[in-house]
Amino acid sequence: MNKQWTIIFALIFTLIVAIFAVINVRSVEVDYLFGRSEWPLILVILGSVLMGALIVFSVGIFQVMKLKREIKTLRKENRTAIHKQEDTHLADQTDTQDASAMIEKKD
């Protein structure tokens, strides 16, 4: 359901940007570090939206990679803790069995 809402919001946002871009079709002057040029406002708007989406996508990918690394570390720690717990449990059982065997030998 969450993915459906994401798609719906993305479509609404795309529609709003498209309408806004189509309404603003005149040329505008764009200043670069090395010069100036005239561009249709629709291209400036769409280029800005695409650059913003690229930045958000890059940050999102970085966050996902960071979380995957953290999950891998936590799973490794979890496995280590489980093995230690099993070893402790087996040692306790062995001690109990040894103690029971010693008591039976004394009797």
Swiss-Prot record:
List each coiled-coil range.
none
The way it spans or sits in the membrane comes to: Multi-pass membrane protein
Q: What UniProt keywords are attached to this protein's entry?
A: Cell membrane, Membrane, Transmembrane, Transmembrane helix
Q: Where is this region: Disordered?
A: 82-107
List cystine links.
none
For this UniProt entry, what is the primary localization, expressed as one broad class? membrane
Task: Please provide, in alphabetical order, the Gene Ontology terms of the cellular component aspect for this entry.
Answer: plasma membrane
Per the record, the domain of life is: Bacteria
Location in the cell reads: Cell membrane
Q: What InterPro entries does the database record attribute to this sequence? A: LapA_dom
Stretches that traverse the bilayer: 5-25, 42-62
Q: Where is the composition biased (Basic and acidic residues)?
A: 82-92
Name under which the protein is recorded:
Uncharacterized protein YrvD
* UniProt source species: Bacillus subtilis (strain 168)
Encoding gene (name): yrvD
